[in-house]
Every structure is written in C-alpha cells, then in structure tokens.
C-alpha cells in the first residue's frame, strides 16, 4: 500500500505527514477524559508513550535499510511523540489547585502585569512561603495566582514583593461547549487560582535569593515594563501605547476602544510581534549591513559578507525576542528567521514549507498546548499560505508585471491570501471577520514596514544616549497615521462583522485539505481543495445556538439570540461572560430592559418564533394567556401548567453547568460545557416529551 501511495506524494513535502500526525497525537491526548490528565493515570500515560516513542525510534533506526518499514515506524514514532510530549507537559504542571472559593492574605513576588489601559489590571503573583494558603497546605509556594485590581497601574515594581488580601477561585473549566479551555492554558502557565484584590496592596522587603536565570528574566521584564512606560510618557495617546506594543510587546497600555478599532479594521495583527516585525528587524538589519558593505566592494568581496550579515541579523532578532517577552508569535517568527539564516549559511533555499513545518515542530515540542491558541494558529496559517505562494511563484519564474507594479500587486496578493487563510481561525477565536482587512493592510503594512519599524529601531538605540526625544516626533507621525487608518476602516459597513465560529471539526477538515493539496502531486491535489470546500460547508451548516445559560457558581443568567444580529441578556453579565456569549452565538449582546420584564416580557427569535420570559411568578398567568408566543422560559418554579397547553421551561434549576440552548419549534435542547446534550421536558407536563 505504501508503495502505491508513494508516487503520488511530492517528496520534499513528506514532512507534512509527520507534522499532521504529531499534531494528531497532541489533539488525541487533549480529547482523553480528565482522569488521564492528572495523578497516577497521567504518570502511566507519560511512561508508556515515552517508552513507546523511544523504542519505536530505535527500531526505526535499526531497520532503516527497509525503506517502507522505516518510514512507517518513523510516522508511528512521531504520532506517539505527540501524545508523550503533551502528557509530559501536563505532568510537569500537575500541581494542586483549590476546589472552591477562598479568601486569604497572600504575599509573593509580582512577576507580570497585563490588562487594558482603561480596565482593571491583572497581577501575576508567585506565592511566598508565608502566605496563608501556603502555610495551610492549600497551594504550594512558588505557585502563581492571577488577581485583578483597579488600584494598581505602576509597572516599575515588577519583581518586587507585595502583600494583599484576595478572593480566589479555581481555574475555570471550559466556559461553553466548543470554546477554548482556558483552564488548561492556565495550568501549563502554573496558574493555580484566579480572583480579585479586596484590600490595599502593600510593598514588602525583598529578601529572597533566586537563580541567575530568574534574575535575567526579571531584568528583562523590568526593562520591558520600564521602556514601555517611557514610550507612553514620551508620545501622546494613543501613539505611545501602540509603540510599546510594536517594540516590546507590551499591549496593556492600549485602551479597549483603540484595540477594537484595530481589530475591526483587520490591523490587530500589527499589534502582536510576529513575522512582519521579525522580518523587518532581522532582515532589515541584514540589508543595511550588506548595503554599507556594497559601498566598499573591494573589501567586502574578499569574504562572504551576506553570511556574516545573516549571523548579526540573527543576534539582533534574538535580542528583539527577549525584549518582547518571547510570545508564541515572536518565537514562531524567530524560529522561521533562524531557519532562513541557516539556509543562507548553507547556501540553501530559505523560504520553504519544510522550514515552516520545522518551526511548528520546534514550538509544539516545547509547548504542545500552543496548538490550541489563536496566536499559533493565526501566525502559522498566514505564514504557510504565503510560503506556499512564494514557492509556486518561484517555480513559475519572475512576474510579467511592470517593475513599478510588482510590489503593489505582490502586497495585494499577500494581503488577500493572509486574510483568507486566517479568516476561519479568527472566526473561531474572536467571532469576527473583517472584509475590509485587505484594503487596510495594503496601506498599513507598508506604513509599518517602511516607516514605523525602522524609526522604532532608531528610537530604541537613541534612548541609550538620551536622544529619543529627537526621533519620537517622527515615529509619532507614523503611528498617528496607522491609528487614523484603523479608525477610518473600522467605520466601514460590516467592519468587525460578527460570525458564528466554524467549530473544530470544520477547522480540522480544512487544515487536512490544505495539507493534502500540498502533499500530493497536481492531479490528486484537487482532493485537498475539495476537503477545504467541505470544511467550509460544515461551517456554513453548523447549528448556531439560540441562546446561552450561564449557571456555574451563580444564579442562572439567560442570554437569547434575537433579530438583527443582536442578542439580549436577561441578567447582568460580566464583560468576560458577555464576550464568551457573543463569540459562541455570533451576535453582539445587549442588556435587555429588565424593568419591562418584571414580571414578564416577550422575546422574538430570528427563526420567526417568540417566547415569554418570566422573571416573577405573577407573570406566568399573563404569559400563559399570550397567544402570540410558542413557549415560556421562566426563572421561577411554576406551580401549575398553562391551560392552553403552552410549554413552560423552568431554567431556575439548571445550575452547575453553562449551557448552549437550541430551539426547534417546541423542542428545547441543552448542551452543557462538557458536551453532554439532552432534551428538556416542559415543567409540569403530564406526559413524557
């Protein structure tokens, strides 16, 4: 069978099979029941799959003379390695967590601050040994807790010891079915609890001794925070905040309104350090070195100047990653840059899909859970599609456009391809699609690449000599232009268009299709394109919830989808829960006029049906008599059925889970946040539903 399939595969693309199986192993581990994610079962899993991977690799090497067996065994090893590394990551972060809310006095070292400029700050604190919850053996010393506060905005105390009284809760489970599991991400970051501050924050003497590596990390964090604060003070709003995001990856100074404008215009990717920024910093430096070398041809021709320039560019790129705090997007970009540098040093083709796969392998090997993050998916989707386009363009030869049109046409093509490749992932993680992103990026990318980032490099260097005030006005002008562009595009119709997420099944089918289209020879590659279309069809026909019910640890809070792409909340929602509801339903959420719903009110669904929402018991009688509605949703327990036979669904008892609500005529279906589905029977119904 292997010999029959082998001629259909493009030889240099075989690495796609390995990457696909490696990711499949990671996904399989995360699909396992929770019992396999902690304790002795997790230890067994790690042991079995690590040994299996090692033994399989040994056998594959021993039998390498038999090509078919060797390749099959190697693919098996890659698959088991995905499971082994994913389970090992969880085993290394298998620490005790609180099981319920606790109030305690804590102290520890402040290691990070994030949030938005106009919202509450979030403090990341490494617990000290004298904290109440540590002395009572609730949480271990060194564990991280995240707490929010509106009384702390100064970042200069990163690394300092602080004390406060807090209310802590366990890391959240999956909020809604089909949504990211933030609890697992918190786990791999050693975050054991989250909550909020309920007292004043006080500074404490810092008398602890740490390792050299810890001191280096602390120095970089303090530098990043201090430089970001300096940029904010140096430039007017919002230019200083945008500069901090571009140069050192500190986005907490950006207000929510400014970020929303960038997101709706399709320019939010410019605020996260990624391949664009790394390419400008790294290879821009290499170009400058080669330019000055070209001024002295007699000397520069005596040695391989381009290779020395590549090495210097790699060092500069590494410094940029450290300055930015090494987020996934920056690590991916730096990994790609290093592969390009290695290709230059070995006189090989640099931009290849193989190098993209190697960078993905490297990141996922060290952080398997990154596979499920928006940063990883968006950055690799954009990078892969651009490299695929570049390789196909290189095979076709130079473009036939006039030289003055080549750069604009290439920019338009790259922007279009990037927008198409990232749209499903943006919809999955953010619930929005930006039709005008192509227009915004045609202007925004050259503005960032040719003006803002080069001036930013000069500004960073000039800060060392106290001359940043000379360069700041020039960078401010470029940043203002970028902000005005985002503001202008965000005002267009359908900018930031709310859509329902495609779901992981559709994403898997589409990714599989893209890989097959690049793996197989041309006639068979159409199978992959067909799978991409099928994945889009799965997205199109995926049922969209008619509402959500948040009931974990709280009184049930009902949100129902409405007409004109606007959902209504029949209880006050936190900003976080509102964003989760909007993402899952693909609609904006507004607070209903609760005064009109006392004791009852009418809700219209986009399906053409209506329901009565009953908030008080005395509203049941009027709701039963309303002939224009199909059923009743009540937050109070009914004592009698409707004489008309209208179904009454009691949501007051639906506690302990968050639910997706699906309504089909008079049928009422709930899916909890763990994926368990059931049809709900009307209250007081005399016969089974």
Language-model features: locations:
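Hydrophobic core of alpha-helical transmembrane segments in multi-pass integral membrane proteins
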Residues: 44-61, 80-85, 507-518, 531-538
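Membrane-interface helix/helix-cap signal primarily in integral membrane proteins
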Residues: 2-9, 63-269, 637-642, 649-688
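Non-globular, low-confidence helical/coil segments that flank catalytic cores
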Residues: 37-38, 133, 151-167, 178, ...
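Hydrophobic alpha-helical transmembrane segments in multi-pass membrane proteins
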Residues: 8, 17, 25, 70-72, ...
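Membrane-interface amphipathic/re-entrant loop segments adjacent to transmembrane helices
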Residues: 203-219, 225, 260, 264, ...
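Hydrophobic alpha-helical segments
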Residues: 1-37, 343-344, 458-469, 476, ...
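Divalent metal-coordination and catalytic microenvironments
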Residues: 25, 108, 166, 246, ...
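Membrane-helix interface and helix-disruption motif detector
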Residues: 33-45, 66-68, 439, 496-500
């Amino acid at each position: 069978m292997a010999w029959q399939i082998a001629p259909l595969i493009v030889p240099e693309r075989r690495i796609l099979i390995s990457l696909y199986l490696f990711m499949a192993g990671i996904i399989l581990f995360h699909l396992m029941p929770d019992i396999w994610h902690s304790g002795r079962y997790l230890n067994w899993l790690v042991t079995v799959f690590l040994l299996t991977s090692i033994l399989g690799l040994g056998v594959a090497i021993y039998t390498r003379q038999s090509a078919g067996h060797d390749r099959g065994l190697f693919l098996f090893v890659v698959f088991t390695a995905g499971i082994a590394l994913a389970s090992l990551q969880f085993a290394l972060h298998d620490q005790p967590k609180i099981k319920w809310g606790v109030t305690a006095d804590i102290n520890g070292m402040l290691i990070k601050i994030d949030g938005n400029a106009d919202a509450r700050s979030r403090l990341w604190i490494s617990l000290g040994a004298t904290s109440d919850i540590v002395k009572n053996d609730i949480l271990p010393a060194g564990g991280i807790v995240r707490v929010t506060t509106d009384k702390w905005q100064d970042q200069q105390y990163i690394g300092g010891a602080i004390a406060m009284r807090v209310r802590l809760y366990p890391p959240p489970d999956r909020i809604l079915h089909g949504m990211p599991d933030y609890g697992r991400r918190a786990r791999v970051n050693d975050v054991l609890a989250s909550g909020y501050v309920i007292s004043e924050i006080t500074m404490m003497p810092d008398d602890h001794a740490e390792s050299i590596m810890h001191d280096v990390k602390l120095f970089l964090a303090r530098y990043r925070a201090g430089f970001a604060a300096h940029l904010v003070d140096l430039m007017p709003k919002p230019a200083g905040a945008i500069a901090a995001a571009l140069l050192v990856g500190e986005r907490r100074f950006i207000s929510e309104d400014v970020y929303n404008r960038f997101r709706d215009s399709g320019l939010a990717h410019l605020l996260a350090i990624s391949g664009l920024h790394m390419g400008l910093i790294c290879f821009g430096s290499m170009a400058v070195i080669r330019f000055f070398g070209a001024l002295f041809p007699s000397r520069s021709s005596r040695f391989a100047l381009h290779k020395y320039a590549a090495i210097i560019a790699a060092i500069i790129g590494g410094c940029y990653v450290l300055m930015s705090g090494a987020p996934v997007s920056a690590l991916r970009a730096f990994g790609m840059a290093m592969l390009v540098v290695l290709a230059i040093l070995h006189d090989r083709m640099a931009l290849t899909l193989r190098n993209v796969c190697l960078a993905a392998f490297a990141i996922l090997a060290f952080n398997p859970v990154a596979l499920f993050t928006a940063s990883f998916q968006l950055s690799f989707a954009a990078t892969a599609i651009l490299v695929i386009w570049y390789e196909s363009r290189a095979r076709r030869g130079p473009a036939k456009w006039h030289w003055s049109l080549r750069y604009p046409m290439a920019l338009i093509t790259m922007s279009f391809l990037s927008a198409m490749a990232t749209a499903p992932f943006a919809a999955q993680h953010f619930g929005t699609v930006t039709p005008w992103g192509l227009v915004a990026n045609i202007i925004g990318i050259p503005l960032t690449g040719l003006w803002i980032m080069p001036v930013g490099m000069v500004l960073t260097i000039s800060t060392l000599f106290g001359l940043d005030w000379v360069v700041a006005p020039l960078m401010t002008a470029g940043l203002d232009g970028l902000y005005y562009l985002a503001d202008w595009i965000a005002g267009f119709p359908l900018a930031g268009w709310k859509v329902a997420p495609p779901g992981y099944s559709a994403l898997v089918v589409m990714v599989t299709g893209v890989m097959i289209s690049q793996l197989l020879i041309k006639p068979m590659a159409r199978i992959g394109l067909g799978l991409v279309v099928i994945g889009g069809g799965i997205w199109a026909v995926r049922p969209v919830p008619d509402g959500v019910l948040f009931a974990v640890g709280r009184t049930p809070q009902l949100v129902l989808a409405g007409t004109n792409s606007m959902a209504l909340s029949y209880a006050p929602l936190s900003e976080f829960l509102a964003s989760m509801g909007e993402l899952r339903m693909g609609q904006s959420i507004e607070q209903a006029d609760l005064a009109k719903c006392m004791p009852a009110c009418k809700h219209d669904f986009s399906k053409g049906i209506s329901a009565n929402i009953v908030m008080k018991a005395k509203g049941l009688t009027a709701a039963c008599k309303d002939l224009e509605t199909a059923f009743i949703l009540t937050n109070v327990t009914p004592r009698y059925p409707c004489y008309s036979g209208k179904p009454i669904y009691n949501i007051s008892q639906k506690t302990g889970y968050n639910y997706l609500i699906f309504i089909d005529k008079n049928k009422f279906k709930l899916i909890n946040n763990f994926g368990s589905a059931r049809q709900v029977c009307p209250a007081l119904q005399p016969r089974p539903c």
